[in-house]
């Protein structure tokens, strides 16, 4: 992205974030869980990315929307969690 396009991109980003509002989905007579209101930065960024993908933006390449749930954020795989033995090396 060129430097001259950066202020325009930031302006569009701030306007889009101001217009994004999370509304809970109303459940009918069945006992389904309502959709959580999304106030986290990760969720807002995800919603902005989906908004830009579905709109006709000319800021960059068209990326496909990601389909991840709210349970994905903040999760680690077991391979990333350090074990206690590797932490002992830092104490030496």
UniProtKB/Swiss-Prot annotation:
The modification Tyrosine amide is found at residue 73. Residues 1-22 form the signal peptide. Amylin/IAPP is a glucoregulatory peptide hormone that plays an important role in the regulation of energy homeostasis. Selectively inhibits insulin-stimulated glucose utilization and glycogen deposition in muscle, while not affecting adipocyte glucose metabolism. IAPP function is mediated by the CALCR-RAMPs (AMYRs) receptor complexes. Amylin can also bind CALCR receptor in the absence of RAMPs, although it is more selective for AMYRs. The mature protein is largely unstructured in the absence of a cognate ligand. One of its GO terms (biological process) is amylin receptor signaling pathway. Keywords: Amidation, Amyloid, Cleavage on pair of basic residues, Disulfide bond, Hormone, Secreted, Signal. Belongs to the calcitonin family. GO terms for cellular component: extracellular space. Disulfide bonds join 38-43. PROSITE patterns: CALCITONIN (PS00258). Residues 23-34, 77-92 form a propeptide. Its main location: secreted. It comes from Mesocricetus auratus. This is Islet amyloid polypeptide. Can form homodimers. Interacts with IDE and INS. Interaction with INS inhibits homodimerization and fibril formation. It comes from the Eukaryota. SMART domains: CALCITONIN (SM00113). GO terms for molecular function: hormone activity; receptor ligand activity. It is found in: Secreted.
